[in-house]
From Swiss-Prot:
CDD domains, per database record: CYCLIN_ScPCL7-like
Name under which the protein is recorded: PHO85 cyclin-10
Organism (species): Saccharomyces cerevisiae (strain ATCC 204508 / S288c) (Baker's yeast)
Keyword entries, A-Z: Carbohydrate metabolism, Cyclin, Cytoplasm, Glycogen metabolism
Biological-process GO terms, alphabetical: glycogen metabolic process; negative regulation of glycogen biosynthetic process; regulation of glycogen biosynthetic process
Major site of localization recorded for this protein: cytoplasm
Gene3D superfamilies, per database record: Cyclin-like (1.10.472.10)
Note: Present with 217 molecules/cell in log phase SD medium.
Family of the protein in this entry: Belongs to the cyclin family. PHO80 subfamily.
Domain of life, per lineage: Eukaryota
Amino acid sequence: MDMTKNHTTDTEEFDDGDIRPVSLGIVDDYNASFELPLKPKFLQSENFSDLTSEWDQSRSNTPGLAEGKTEKAQPCGTTDSSKNRIHVEQLLESANEMNNYLAQNIENINNFQVGLLNGGKGLYSSMGDDSSACINGTNFSSTSNFELSDDELEDTTGCTSSIFDKDLFHQQNGLSIPRRRSPLFKSPTASFEIGDATDVEEQDIDDSIFSECSSITSFDMGGLHISLPHDEEEDQEKTKSESENPLLHGIPVDVEVPHISVDEALANFKETIELLLKLSGNRKCTGFNTRVEKKEYSNFYMKSKPTLSSADFLKRIQDKCEYQPTVYLVATFLIDTLFLTRDGNNILQLKLNLQEKEVHRMIIAAVRLSTKLLEDFVHSHEYFSKVCGISKRLLTKLEVSLLICVCNTKLMVSNRKLAASKLLLNELRSFCV
């Protein structure tokens, strides 16, 4: 039987070189066919031209690559840098625009630089409600827009207070830092190294040194009289000395501080300031106390009244710092201590007249000092100065000035003082009716 009759192969040729279908037919029991995408032998080299082409050193290193299409190897990163490269004409045009801008605004730029060197003189910033950052749960925003007086900006190296520390110019940038020790209480401390010997006598320490140190009960520094606690007897004397404060008359020692919200504490603080302003405007209620340091108290005076009201200013401080109610209670008592006293008939009387141009700086100093008396963690010097819209140097000056003004009173916070702020407000209300 001839096998060529059973297996037949049909081929068709195409002039365009397309794939020629090859059909294999098996005609025994049925007719079945399938197609394979193959090319004839004379076109097979085009299936894998890169592999079948001969090597030619005169051509490209890549076999099968047409002449004129050779690619040169480029170092890594040259393609991206060439795409981002600025044209020379565009660069010259940008430089020309920058020179024109500097020529038109060179005077403003010089004034701005001089203002920075003078500690911020003449610089203004908008007090916006939008915050640009939120770190440690505290909003960070721009400063306020009221102008600082010229007195604290003329001298860039010193301060009106003799206890000003130059190290306060170098504050850290953190918004929440551990509580720092005040420079008011910075005193040189003796330091010595203990050797390997365990016997104390080998250190040659004279007991008289300790006896002299233990005999020191108080000292004066920068106009402040600072007493050092030693034992329980002195603690009892402190509680007795609180009764010497005329504002605490009639308040029991074991008084309980009533629960109060932040809004109520802020409202009491605002109302206390408003009543003090009202009393200061009354000719019958004139300040008579001359023991307050006039030089330090003058730091609270501003040349012009701020455009922001004291109520909005307090709201801004609370929004950015989120203080507890006790902070405003202590701040209220500090304001009362500075401006109020009692006469021989146990009636409230003004020691100083409060003016509108002193309110904002008085608020700054009272709130800042209150936080340091109560809290272990306070906002950084830089952050609080930006919240209040003043320089760091002025913030230090206001804080120290308030300390010196109330140096004759005990600063230790007690329940009596927390409760006194509310009771004194009630007396002021009845007194101003």
